[in-house]
Amino acid sequence: MVRAAVGEWNDGCVLDVAVKAGTLHFVAQRVTAIILVFLGLWFAGSIKGLDVLAHGVVVVFIADPLNVFLLTLLTVTLAYHSYLGVQVVIDDYVHAKRITVASHIASRLAHVLFAIAAIYAIIRIGLVA
């Protein structure tokens, strides 16, 4: 029985599915973290020379099509990476089944709403300016 828990006996049971899901979650966290490093460096370098207190300067920066794409990619990646992290915290520290389910639903909803609002703002500024 202990061997099955560590995955030495693989007969296609539920354990195999759980292991694959855990591996995908682990890989997704690492990949999004690497992407965020590069996008974060791009963003920091891009706004370094800008007068970020001047509304017009920021609008012109966001209106560039490349910046619209990269800001949207940054937003989606950040929201997904954050969602993955919050999911781990909920799974590790919330033990009541109903609260766990409610927390997962609330987390997913909050992250999706954040991403939609941010993408809407980026695209709206990109189209108007």
Per-region residue spans from a language model:
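Membrane-embedded alpha-helical bundles that constitute the cytochrome b-like, heme-associated redox core
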Residues: 1-129
